[in-house]
Amino acid sequence: MKIPQFAFVALTALLMATTLPSAASETRDPSDFFFQDSFNDLSEEAELAQNEGKIGVLVVFETDDCPWCDRMKETVLNQAQVQDYFRQHFRLIGLNTDGDALVTGFDGQEVSETDFALLHNRVRATPAFLFFDTEGELLVRFTGTTRDPEEFLWLGEYVVKAHFEHERFSSYKRRRRAASS
């Protein structure tokens, strides 16, 4: 029995559609592959970042009951490409703005996660992504979610390539979106 050509093409397309997307957008648990183990000593994290040749430390502030934090973990931070890019350029630390765990700030002062978020960094909403250099200086603050993994990668690139020195992220993002259209 001979299969008609259109049926062969349709079956091939179906097979490709069911196998290619999984390879193109591999997902991994952000707890294991995005965030790194830490004793919450940010001066130590900055030193590690410097020794590893990284830009600095990305501190992600979240809360347990934050739907936007969950959305970022489920749609962006779980992407292998995002995890690999950010781990290449930053030490990645997650802190809970409602947490009681102690954090040693870049200045060596030990405070609770809550105080570090609110008093030291004025984090009022989550998720908040604060990018620090290896000296503990704040480079970029981004609060909220990104549209998709590509936009979050643009945020990383914006910091890595120091575009923040001469333009706002909204302008950079608009330019990148226009270039990719």
Q: Which role fits each region the language model picked out?
A:
Residues L119-E165:
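Non-catalytic, surface beta->alpha helical segment in thiol-disulfide oxidoreductase systems
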Residues D70-Y85:
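Typically the conserved alpha-helix immediately C-terminal to a functionally engaged Cys/Sec
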Residues G53-C66:
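Short active-site neighborhood of thiol/selenol oxidoreductases, capturing the structured segment around
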Residues S25-G53, R168, Y172-S181:
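N-terminal leader/targeting and pre-domain segments
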Residues V9-T18:
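Bacterial N-terminal signal peptides
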Residues V82-V111:
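Thiol-based oxidoreductase modules, predominantly thioredoxin-like and allied folds used
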Residues M1-V9:
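Bacterial N-terminal signal peptides that target proteins for export
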Residues V57-L58, L92, F129:
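Hydrophobic beta-strand anchors of alpha/beta hydrolase catalytic cores
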